């Protein structure tokens, strides 16, 4: 690690070196990859299967974003930024989404999609792809074992039945091709996180993990820091911290909150992330912000970028309907 720091090697190149001879489970997608990576790693660890894990966020179960294990299996978050995920060699891929993001790097939505198709082509022989149902380039994905998932669409290979919200938790059955797992309870909020969990469950099924162990692991899953994380939860007030920084992620967050707290006033405190993303996704952000009952807009967080003339939070406010 010191050698890498001194000579400036990027993280994904480092991951390429240390995973090239392992059985690799690589989680990609413009949305949800951190959560799904943590879910897969948790299912493997809790069930006793074992894995090495490189997460993009801090696991609420284990208070770390990395752990090691003697089993030569690696669960890794495959980051599309700068096409760095193309350096990995997956045995199992999960592709949660391929929506336009990082357009400062890719230029066009088509180039983002092209990168994900190229990522699918990195799959090792005999490998498996688990992809969100309805991806724009789904017809171009090729694998010996290919599954799609969508919790609310029975046309998907993996879907959900008997979904209920009971005391703030989701109770459901997952139906797959030739298998079914009832009595699942997910305590993490957000309907999108049901999708994320059934993707992780599909990976666990590919590894022949017992259903009972999957049920127990799902019930014990506590989430990832800043992904639908309850900072406060009382009878009077609920405060949720979430890293949602794309219109689709923000919409999923708000929908998830409504599914659990349908009769509560929803106040959204939102800080846009990156000037380029705010500019490229301005219309989507404004439309999504209108879904909240009350909105508090903070100045844009620039991260690695310099300010852009005319790109600011007021621009989003001016495009809102404010109904």
Task: Label the model's feature ranges.
Residues 1-12, 161-162, 189:
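N-terminal leader/targeting and accessory segments in enzymes
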């Amino acid at each position: 690690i010191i050698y890498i720091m001194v000579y400036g090697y990027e993280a994904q190149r480092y991951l390429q070196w240390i995973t090239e001879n392992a059985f690799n489970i690589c989680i990609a997608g413009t949305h949800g990859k951190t959560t799904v990576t943590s879910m897969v790693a948790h299912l493997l660890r809790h069930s006793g299967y074992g894995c090495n894990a490189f997460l993009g966020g801090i696991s609420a179960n284990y208070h770390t974003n990395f752990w090691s294990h003697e089993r030569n299996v690696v669960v890794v978050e495959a980051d599309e930024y700068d096409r760095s995920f193309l350096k990995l060699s997956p045995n199992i891929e999960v592709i949660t989404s391929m929506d336009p993001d990082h357009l400062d790097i890719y230029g066009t939505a088509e180039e983002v999609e092209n990168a994900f198709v190229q990522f699918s082509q990195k799959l090792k022989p005999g490998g498996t792809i688990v992809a969100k149902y309805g991806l724009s380039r789904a017809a171009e994905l090729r694998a010996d074992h290919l599954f799609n998932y969508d919790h609310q669409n029975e046309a998907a290979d993996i879907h959900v039945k008997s979904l209920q919200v009971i005391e703030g938790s989701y109770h459901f059955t997952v139906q797959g091709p030739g298998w079914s797992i009832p009595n699942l309870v997910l305590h993490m909020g957000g309907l999108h996180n049901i999708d994320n969990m059934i993707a992780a469950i599909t990976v666990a099924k590919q590894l022949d993990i017992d259903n009972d162990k999957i049920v127990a692991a799902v019930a014990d899953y506590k989430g990832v820091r800043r992904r639908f994380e309850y900072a406060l939860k009382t009878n009077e007030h609920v405060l949720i911290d979430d890293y949602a920084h794309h219109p689709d992620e923000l919409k999923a967050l708000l929908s998830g909150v409504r599914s659990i707290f349908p009769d509560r006033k929803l106040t959204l405190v939102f800080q846009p992330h990156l000037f380029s993303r705010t500019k490229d996704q301005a219309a989507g952000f404004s439309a999504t912000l209108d879904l909240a009952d009350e909105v508090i807009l903070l100045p844009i967080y620039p991260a690695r970028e310099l300010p852009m003339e005319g790109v600011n939070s007021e621009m989003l406010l001016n495009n809102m309907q404010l109904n």
